[in-house]
Every structure is written in structure tokens, then in C-alpha cells.
């Protein structure tokens, strides 16, 4: 018995690997885990490579204090402009009036061009080549606007007279008659406006009482008869 123990002690001791590490693992399972880890690494790299979106800062709305400050600055600018205009000479005021009026006319003209769909008149009046009624209307509006810029000149009335005459030369007698009728109607309207704008001075004090007699009426009839006779002689 002792001999068997001695022989067993003399024999080599073989250490088996720990089987616990391989429990519940199938063949090739370690390889799958390695592949999974490599995929996760690649996904992390892609996420790192994606460009970050730059956020556009939102413009804050003006506060009450800022709004009040802007209104105050606008009020100061208007006050400075009024002060500047007050110090101008009559000639400078007239020139400033023309400048403001020209700016207003240019703004009105731009609005008219936008209405007709015209984007630019950089080519001048020569760029127009009207054919339809609407195109002639557009051309006329542009020409009238251009001519009206010089209406403050003392030579403007004579210029318009010569211009109308030179244009009407190309018309027939019937068309000139139509132009004449339109001008006469415009003349009548202008007279009405001028009379309405002209205020007649109101006389002060009581009016004098006049005494009319039958002789006054007879004299009036005789005068009317004499005038009628003279007119008749002139006609004959």
C-alpha cells in the first residue's frame, strides 16, 4: 500500500485548465463577441465624424427700453430736420421743396411701374416700343411723369404749348377736334377750381340804398334796344 502511494507521488501532476471559463460557451461564440465590439467601435467613430449643426441665434425682440430709445432717436432726428429747414433761406426752402416733391414723384412712378409689372426704365423713354393700348398708356404715364418734373419752370407753359402743337401735327382734323374738346373740358374744370379757391373779400358796412324809378327801367330798355341795333348793324 505504501508502495502505491510512493509511486503516485513520483508520477507527474497534470493541471487541467479551468473549465468554468468555458461554461455556457458554444464554438465560435468568442468570435461573435469580437465582431460585435468592432461594430460598436465603428458606430462610435461615425457619430464622432458627423458634423455638429450650428444653431442660428434667435434675434431677441426689442424690449420696451430699446423701443423707447429708438423712438427718442427718431424724434431727435425730426427735430434736427425741422431746425435745419427753419434756418434755410427762401431760395433754399424752394429747392428743398422741389427735392421732396421730386422724391415723391419718383416714389409714385415706381409704384405705377410696379403696378404695370415694369421692373426698370433704365433704358429711358427710347426703350419703349408701344404697340397695344395698354403699352401706349404705360408710355404716356412715363412721358407725363418725366415732363411734369419741370412744371415749376417759368418756361413750362410755352413748352407744353409747343409740344402739343408738334404732336397734333401728326393727327387728323377729327382727332385734333377730340383733343380740343378734352382740353376745353379740362379748362372748364380748372376755372371752377380756381374760382372755388379764390375767396372774395366780404364788404364791411351796410350797402347804400338805391332808389329805382320807372324812368330807370325805360332807360334800360332803350339802352338794350340800342345795343341790339348796333349788334345787328355789325352783323349785317
From Swiss-Prot:
Subcellular compartments: Cytoplasm
Pfam families referenced in this protein's UniProt entry, alphabetically: eIF3_subunit
One Gene Ontology biological process: formation of cytoplasmic translation initiation complex
InterPro entries: eIF3-like_dom_sf, eIF3j
Compositionally biased intervals (Acidic residues): 28-46
Sequence ranges of Basic and acidic residues compositional bias: 47-58, 68-88
Main location per the UniProt record: cytoplasm
Annotated region (Disordered), positions in chain: 20-88
Any one GO molecular function term: translation initiation factor activity
Top-level lineage group: Eukaryota
Keyword list, A-Z: Cytoplasm, Initiation factor, Protein biosynthesis
Cellular component per GO, a single term: eukaryotic 43S preinitiation complex
PANTHER family the UniProt entry points to: EUKARYOTIC TRANSLATION INITIATION FACTOR 3 SUBUNIT J
Complexes and interactors: Component of the eukaryotic translation initiation factor 3 (eIF-3) complex. The eIF-3 complex interacts with pix.
HAMAP family attached to this UniProt entry: eIF3j
Similarity field: Belongs to the eIF-3 subunit J family.
Protein task: Component of the eukaryotic translation initiation factor 3 (eIF-3) complex, which is involved in protein synthesis of a specialized repertoire of mRNAs and, together with other initiation factors, stimulates binding of mRNA and methionyl-tRNAi to the 40S ribosome. The eIF-3 complex specifically targets and initiates translation of a subset of mRNAs involved in cell proliferation.
Protein's name in the database: Eukaryotic translation initiation factor 3 subunit J
Upper lineage: Eukaryota, Metazoa, Ecdysozoa, Arthropoda, Hexapoda
Chain's gene name: eIF3j
